[in-house]
């Protein structure tokens, strides 16, 4: 599949404006196609980034630390691949290192990469956990995402405050309940 030109993308926005009954030539909408393309370039910038590159900087043998490390409350906005409507929420990530750790900002950057793609929450949860697991090789990874979905509040069932939760565990978190409980108890205190 070849990528459309910027002009082709702008024409597609004009077509959508006509489809909803608007005049793309009226004053308030003249620059809308350009603005939409600029917004989409930023919003969907995760396609041009590789999680592995973010996780390449590792620290080995840092005080032999082998207990739970977590980053909680990572805010994100992503877009549902079914309706191209936003869903936003919070990600909590924990891992138990084996022989290396990463800088704390790297976990937030991983969330940004996957959130800035057309996405479903379940897949995003899995992608975050698996990218940390594959690149760090920790004893285990735990990820929980809680999000509000505009596709439920703006259309369809019209439920405003329904929160969807997804969790994914690898390694020791998947194998031993006590580690899952430790993670869930930690994030419950937020």
Curated annotation (Swiss-Prot):
InterPro entries: GTP-CH-I_C/QueF, GTP-CH-I_N, GTP_CycHdrlase_I, GTP_CycHdrlase_I_CS, GTP_CycHdrlase_I_dom. It catalyses: GTP + H2O = 7,8-dihydroneopterin 3'-triphosphate + formate + H(+). Pathway: Cofactor biosynthesis; 7,8-dihydroneopterin triphosphate biosynthesis; 7,8-dihydroneopterin triphosphate from GTP: step 1/1. One of its GO terms (cellular component) is cytoplasm. Keywords: GTP-binding, Hydrolase, Metal-binding, Nucleotide-binding, One-carbon metabolism, Zinc. One of its GO terms (biological process) is tetrahydrobiopterin biosynthetic process. It holds the Pfam family GTP_cyclohydroI. SUPFAM superfamilies: Tetrahydrobiopterin biosynthesis enzymes-like. The keyword Protein transport does not apply. Zn(2+) binds at residues 80, 83, 151. One of its GO terms (molecular function) is GTP binding. Its EC number is 3.5.4.16. Belongs to the GTP cyclohydrolase I family. Toroid-shaped homodecamer, composed of two pentamers of five dimers. NCBIfam families: folE, PRK09347.1-2, PRK09347.1-3. This is GTP cyclohydrolase 1. It comes from Rickettsia prowazekii (strain Madrid E).
């Amino acid at each position: 599949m070849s990528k459309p030109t910027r002009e082709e993308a702008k024409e597609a926005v004009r077509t959508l404006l006509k489809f909803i009954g608007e005049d793309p030539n009226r004053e308030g909408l003249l620059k809308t196609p350009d603005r939409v393309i600029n917004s989409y370039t930023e919003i969907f910038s995760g396609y041009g980034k590789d999680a592995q590159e973010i996780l390449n900087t590792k620290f080995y043998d840092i005080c032999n630390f082998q207990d739970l490390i977590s980053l909680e409350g990572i805010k994100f906005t992503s877009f549902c691949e079914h309706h191209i409507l936003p869903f936003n929420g919070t990600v909590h990530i924990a891992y138990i290192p084996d022989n290396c750790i990463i800088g704390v900002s790297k976990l937030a950057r991983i969330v940004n990469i996957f959130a800035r793609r057309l996405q479903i929450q379940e897949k995003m949860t899995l992608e975050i956990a698996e990218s940390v697991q594959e690149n760090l090789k920790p004893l285990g990874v735990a990820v929980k995402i809680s999000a509000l979905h505009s596709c439920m509040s703006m259309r369809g069932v019209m439920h405003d405050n329904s929160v969807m939760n997804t969790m994914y565990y690898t390694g020791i978190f998947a194998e031993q309940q006590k580690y899952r409980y430790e993670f869930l108890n930690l994030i419950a205190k937020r």
